[in-house]
Amino acid sequence: MTKRLFTSESVTEGHPDKICDQISDAVLDAIYEKDPQARVACETAVTTGMVMVMGEITTNCYVDIPKVVRNTIREIGYDRAKYGFDCDTCAVMTSIDEQSSDIAMGVDKALEAKVGEMSEEQVQAIGAGDQGMMFGFACDETPELMPMPIILAHKLTMKLSEVRKNGKVKYLRPDGKSQVTVEYDGDKPVRVDTVVISTQHGADVSHDTIEKDIMEHVIIPVIPRELLDEGTKYFINPTGRFVVGGPQGDSGLTGRKIIVDTYGGYARHGGGAFSGKDPTKVDRSAAYAARYVAKNIVASGIARKCEVQLAYAIGVAKPVSVLVDTFGTAVIPEEKISELVNKHFDLRPAAIINKLNLRRPIYRKTAAYGHFGRDDAEFSWEKTDVADALRKEAGL
C-alpha cells in the first residue's frame, strides 16, 4: 500500500482567533437564553488591550455585551495584566445594528411559501439565511468517526488547557497550538510521525523544563502508545520562547479558524464560519446537518468514509443540491444512499433547527476544540440515531 502523511492542527481557547469565536458565541448564547427567536450575526476582533464586538442582531431582549465579553475572557484565563491581556482592564467597544430588512424578508418567509409551494405550517416556512455550500464528513478512523489527525490535535490542546487550569503545570498561559502528522498506509492510520506543541508560558521557566513537562503531562497521556515509535518527531516550543501571546502577540478575528473547527483539512470546506451565527444561517446549521448525515451513514456501516455537500439559495428553504460521496468505500450504490438521505433527512433550515434542537444557548462550548467529534450532550448533530434505520433499509 502507498504510505503518506497528513497533518492537522488545533489551537487552545486562549488563541486570539479562538477568543473571538468564544466571545461571539457567548453573545449568541446570552441572547438565546432570553430570546430563542433572535437573529444574531456577531463578529469580534481583539488586539492589545482592546475588544471590538460588531454585527447585526435583531432581538426583543437586552444583553450586557461588555459583561459577557469580560466574563468570557476571564473564563479563558486572561485575568492578569502580566498575561498580556486582562479581562477587567481591556477596552470593550460595541457596534451593533439590526439584521437587514432585505435579508429578513427572505428568512421570515421562504420563496416556496410565497409562491404557494409550502404552507406557513410546513416547518415554519423559513428560508435559508444566505446562499452557499456546506460540507459534512465522517470516517471510521476513530471512535468519534473523525479523521485521526484533527482528533489527536484537539485532544492535545484540550490537555494543555486542562493542565494549565488544574495547576499541574503552573507556568502555562492560555495561548497555545498543536499539530499532529499521521502516517497512513493506504487509507489506514498506522503511526504518528510528528507532534508539534507551542504553548505560551511564564518568563521564568527554562525551555528544558517546558519540553519535559509537555511530554510528561500532555503528549504521553494523549497519544496512544501504539502510535508512537522511535521515529516519531517532537517539536515543543521550537522557537525557544513563547512569553508574549494572546491578543498582545497577535490580533484575532471571529471565523479565522474554520479548518480547526471542522475536519483539519481532511475534508472540503464551503468557506463559511460558524461562531456568532444563529442557526437560520445555513453556514452553521447546514454544516451541522451535513455532519449528522455523514456520521449516520458511516455509523450504519453503509460506507467507511462519507462526505456530504449541501447548497442553498438565500430565501429558499429546500437545498439546491445534495451530494453524497463515499470515495469508493460504500457497500451499496451511491444512488441508493442518496435516496436514503432524501427519505430520512429533511434538510430545510427550519427542519434542521427542529431536528437538532438548535434554538438553545449551546454554542459557547462549540467555539473551542472543534464543533465535531465531541460527545457532549449539547452536540445533537453527533447523534447516530438514524443509523439503524439506514442499515435496515440498506439490507445490512
From Swiss-Prot:
Binding positions (L-methionine): E56, Q99, D250, K281
Pfam families listed in its UniProt record: S-AdoMet_synt_C (PF02773), S-AdoMet_synt_M (PF02772), S-AdoMet_synt_N (PF00438)
Pathway(s) this gene product operates in, as recorded in its UniProt entry: Amino-acid biosynthesis; S-adenosyl-L-methionine biosynthesis; S-adenosyl-L-methionine from L-methionine: step 1/1
MF annotations from Gene Ontology: ATP binding; magnesium ion binding; methionine adenosyltransferase activity
One GO BP annotation of this record: one-carbon metabolic process
Principal localisation: cytoplasm
This protein's UniProt keywords: ATP-binding, Cytoplasm, Magnesium, Metal-binding, Nucleotide-binding, One-carbon metabolism, Potassium, Transferase
Subcellular location: Cytoplasm
Flexible loop: region residues: 99-109
Cellular component GO terms, alphabetical: cytoplasm
Recorded catalytic activity of this chain's protein: L-methionine + ATP + H2O = S-adenosyl-L-methionine + phosphate + diphosphate
SUPFAM superfamilies associated with the record: S-adenosylmethionine synthetase
Cofactor(s) the protein requires to work: Mg(2+); K(+)
InterPro entries named among the record's database cross-references: ADOMET_SYNTHASE_CS, S-AdoMet_synt_C, S-AdoMet_synt_central, S-AdoMet_synt_N, S-AdoMet_synthetase, S-AdoMet_synthetase_sfam
EC number: 2.5.1.6
Residues binding ATP: H15, D175, G176, K177, R241, F242, D250, R256, K257, A273, K277
Family: Belongs to the AdoMet synthase family.
Role description: Catalyzes the formation of S-adenosylmethionine (AdoMet) from methionine and ATP. The overall synthetic reaction is composed of two sequential steps, AdoMet formation and the subsequent tripolyphosphate hydrolysis which occurs prior to release of AdoMet from the enzyme.
Quaternary state and interactors: Homotetramer; dimer of dimers.
PANTHER family linked to this entry: S-ADENOSYLMETHIONINE SYNTHETASE (PTHR11964)
UniProt-listed NCBIfam families: metK
Protein name per Swiss-Prot or TrEMBL: S-adenosylmethionine synthase
Provenance organism: Ruminiclostridium cellulolyticum (strain ATCC 35319 / DSM 5812 / JCM 6584 / H10)
